[in-house]
Amino acid sequence: MDPAASSCMRSLQPPAPVWGCLRNPHSEGNGASGLPHYPPTPFSFHQKPDFPATATAAYPDFSASCLAATPHSLPQEEHIFTEQHPVFPQSPNWHFPVSDARRRPNSGPAGGSKEMGTSSLGLVDTTGGPGEDYGVLGSTANETEKKSSRRRKESSDNQENRGKPEGSSKARKERTAFTKEQLRELEAEFAHHNYLTRLRRYEIAVNLDLSERQVKVWFQNRRMKWKRVKGGQPVSPNGQDPEDGDSTASPSSE
């Protein structure tokens, strides 16, 4: 092993010489102080170029401890700098402003980050605004198309419903199926009287097991058919429609 490395290892074992060197930085110059005398360390860092690289590679911890050596091993300029400027000249009062200053910038960026977050959200909203507008326009267009289709369907349904009552009324007329006996009696009555009085209509309805409305509708249809065939207009002896006179004289049974 190299003598310098072995001396460094031996110097780490007894801590007293190291502390003596630290507390007596000018021991190299005068050699006398008020502290008890300690034997000088057998090594010096003025021989740094002669220190082999193998020792530093083999013992990195010891080489680092040796590099952080006593002040007397440093050059003269570093001695002067350390004497004029202590190593730790900071006072406890100086730490508080620094901590406050550190806290303030930390709090500042936090608030700024919040503001930036809100502003970024605002920017996102503003940038997303046109997209939302386009989406709203598209939804309104779809709604208008749906409404127009609904209106068309409703109009077609209304037309169908309008056509349905006519068809239903025709179906009702067709569903009114008279028997042969009923038709014979109605034809005989129509041959004698084209218009029926209310009383006579009631009697025929009771005799034929029909309603007065069915009898009235049958006579109306029969008169229309007779008018189309003959082309003439029948006139009652009194010059008015007996059914109309009966309807004005008495309330309708419908």
Curated annotation (Swiss-Prot):
GO terms for molecular function: chromatin binding; DNA-binding transcription activator activity, RNA polymerase II-specific; DNA-binding transcription factor activity; HMG box domain binding; RNA polymerase II cis-regulatory region sequence-specific DNA binding; sequence-specific DNA binding. The keyword Metal-binding does not apply. Residues 87-178, 227-254 are annotated as: Disordered. Residues 154-178 have a biased composition (Basic and acidic residues). SUPFAM superfamilies: Homeodomain-like. Keywords: Activator, Cytoplasm, Developmental protein, DNA-binding, Homeobox, Nucleus, Repressor, Transcription, Transcription regulation. InterPro entries: HD, HD_metazoa, Homeobox_CS, Homeodomain-like_sf, MOX-1/MOX-2. It is found in: Nucleus; Cytoplasm. One of its GO terms (cellular component) is nucleus. Residues 171-230 bind DNA. SMART domains: HOX. The keyword Repressor applies. Gene3D superfamilies: Homeodomain-like (1.10.10.60). One of its GO terms (biological process) is somite specification. Mesodermal transcription factor that plays a key role in somitogenesis and is specifically required for sclerotome development. Required for maintenance of the sclerotome polarity and formation of the cranio-cervical joints. Binds specifically to the promoter of target genes and regulates their expression. Activates expression of NKX3-2 in the sclerotome. Activates expression of CDKN1A and CDKN2A in endothelial cells, acting as a regulator of vascular cell proliferation. While it activates CDKN1A in a DNA-dependent manner, it activates CDKN2A in a DNA-independent manner. This is Homeobox protein MOX-1.
